[in-house]
């Protein structure tokens, strides 16, 4: 049966001819050396070029990363080896290495060594800790040495491939080869070692169009791989999968089974001849170099083949080797830390006759099924004995221990608990996947159909593209995961049972309302498990989340890809495994899950009984959950974090609680936030206290001016000046009518030009003094400009109404300290504004006109004997009052100006 590997192209980039490729172990980088003389580093995640080195004008036939030094080493046809720092782009070393083209460079995995092979038929060893000195030369080949590669199982030895048709095995301590393999009928282009621990194999590729697998201990050919129609230019044993990859000048890459040597797949991306294949350990990515560019593919899934039963026993597969570990073997004395790798004792359980692609315990943990290569085998979990086997693409367990096998897209078999075939189904559609659990599910590309296990009756068809399916242990809830989101559905078991008991016919879409969609979440689920009514999963961003009642909580941010194994209730821990089979645990309290579940069901009494069992450090988590359910009052009672509790109190308008928290925390931002809420709520005394604590001087100015609190404004002016808040201090002083202090503040703030303009507007008598200061200050930077400043005392003709302004200042000086009560504002609000200079001038004009008219009328009155002395006296008294208060005649189009709550005359600038 075929290996059935998923092959996905992850990177494609056209370029000049690619002669070698390499993958970085930690960065998402592909290193490609080109025939044009350039070495490029591509980022396969962003699909962009990250670095580029112009090495030479001749071909660079080999380049490799040296990650532990942040270097790239490259060998070219100009016979030089060059070393670059790929971070700084600096050239670290350049030296002439050979007397002919350099075909290959190989980096020792641990020691500071680099091997190079050349058309001069020599292999040389270079030590970078010894100034890149050549410490050894290996002679023996009689033609070009095309490739050298270190043995990963014994890094003191290496193999070389030559066009003299041989493979030679060398030891770093000896200039002579250990032995020679007469490998092919024509020149050998490439060689690679098998990285697994069980086979002493290497593979070679030749111009005779074949690749051969060799046992280097017996020095015999194990298998010849025929199929290419041109020279085989690149070969490799994949480090993670049981496959051999060969590339040829016929333009194809062929994938062979490493055990059966069966051809599994052939790739042809239409980029002409294949020259290089690159891979790294612990990755399923393979990069291929062609005449016209670079391709990277991902083979299979990176999810580790592992399963854990409810007791904490884990079984996993490393290639064909089966290993086991038990979490409970650590002991109760071990204090587990979240995110820390568990020190498990790993034991060899046995081997598997097929290459495992999936492994799963049955519900009671007694059996384990392994699937792969189109077959399945059921083993006993303890002794690893073969219990049953058969052909099948997929195998699933029911929640009761029955099982189903998908033999093809048109045939599914159901087996009893004793693994006896009970039923065979031929669905009316192409079944691409099956899932087990409470119901048997079959998927096409567009929908999923649920069937009961007993009689395979259709329960319901749901139109959704399904990637995975997770049943809760109760059988009442199911999570359906697609490529971009997941859905939580409720299975109405009683409704379905009553439907079938009634004998009513079932239509093609199944039982209506068999499933009810409870929640939908736009997150991609990588792996998931249920704990009660809580769905735990990790998403595409590698966050470990759990979902209760549609509310998603992030437990932890994972620092690398990890996959869920299961949950052990008596430890309140969820366990995950990474690609290296490291097991990691995280705390998830069962009491917390139960509490949230009861709240979702509306059973608050039982939830409150569980609350005391939840540790205090988790109460904020509970409070956030309650807030999301709209239970803000309850959240406020439970919350322990002062910041969060303060936000809840503000949200509820509980100002006293918020004040207590603010007093405890003494946070300026909290006082300010509380002050704004108190102001909007009419709690003016609290607002004042908050603004004082928060040093919100602008808010205090607004409050005091609104209240007409002159004393408060006066104190605020002093405080603002101390705090350096000159704008607030100026407004306070101006509001109080303390114009001299305003001028002084401007001068002290070195705002002398503004002080001069203010003096001209409000205190003309101070202009000369300020102008003198201005001249003195300006003369330091521009003497000519300083001389051009005009003093009104010297040039009064340049200042309109100067004498009038002085008179107005003298007449209004006494009124600046008088403040009209705020309650009288309505009687002053409608009066028009006018400059006091203009008002003063109007008064003078009216007085003159009144005087002239008054003399004529008096003479006429004397002649007629009708002198109305009484009326004249009243008018005179009214004029005197108006003159004292600075009020213009009500019949005039001009009016008084309100300054600081008092009617005063303001001079015109």
From Swiss-Prot:
Membrane protein topology class: Peripheral membrane protein
WD repeats: 13-52, 55-94, 97-136, 140-180, 183-224, 227-266, 269-309, 351-390, 461-501
Subcellular location, principal: cytoplasm
Pfam families: B-prop_COPA_B_2nd, TPR_COPA_B, WD40
Cellular component GO terms held in the UniProt record: COPI-coated vesicle membrane; Golgi membrane; membrane coat
Biological processes annotated in GO: intracellular protein transport; vesicle-mediated transport
InterPro entries xrefs: Beta-prop_COPA/B_2nd, Coatomer_complex_subunit, COPB2, G-protein_beta_WD-40_rep, TPR_COPA_B, WD40/YVTN_repeat-like_dom_sf, WD40_repeat_dom_sf, WD40_rpt
Gene3D superfamilies listed in its UniProt record: 1.25.40.470, YVTN repeat-like/Quinoprotein amine dehydrogenase (2.130.10.10)
Composition bias type Acidic residues, residue spans: 870-892
Keyword tags: Cytoplasm, Cytoplasmic vesicle, ER-Golgi transport, Golgi apparatus, Membrane, Protein transport, Repeat, Transport, WD repeat
PROSITE patterns: WD_REPEATS_2 (PS50082), WD_REPEATS_REGION (PS50294)
The protein's assembly and partners: Oligomeric complex that consists of at least the alpha, beta, beta', gamma, delta, epsilon and zeta subunits.
Protein family according to the UniProt entry: Belongs to the WD repeat COPB2 family.
Name used for this protein in its record: Coatomer subunit beta'-3
